[in-house]
């Protein structure tokens, strides 16, 4: 998993990784992307922060080191008996809006790629720090704030129950997928050693054909993408890089 870092010197306290007991899921609550949010929090004292931001395309940006205490779920009063900034990691999901931007609006929604990467990141952090699934909670569960809005009202295709089920699945009991799989109206390519789909990256087939996969792991077609050589390449209707 690629994690881009744009760390802020502000808006956090020093800590150690043995403090981590909870993972708190948020939504940004505005229309900015992950990198833009990291830049904002790195630009001065904001009175708030989070460890990670997950973008619309599934890319992940880190603003605060895991060991340090971000200011993401502090409040004067709490609903949760234990979870606080001092013992948690905060993950912010970038969010779209189709109408009203009020906190209580049902017009907020997540992109598929955002949710897929947030699940992957959460599972990675759970495994790394020994955080059980019942310690992955919403900002709403900590303070009562309507955050993350789509996971409080559960009015879209992406629900909190679905998210919890995805992070709770036992990877040892799941049959690892490998190679090309037709899913969700498109194609994914699963790496045999991990059972994870290629995301936000190129893949070369044995015949020398190159493909690009988005943040949800879906093969991209009829679009231009840049490669590591800095050049732009066109992906045909079959997803293959057009070389001539």
Predicted regions span which residues?
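Structural motif
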Residues: 22, 86-88, 210
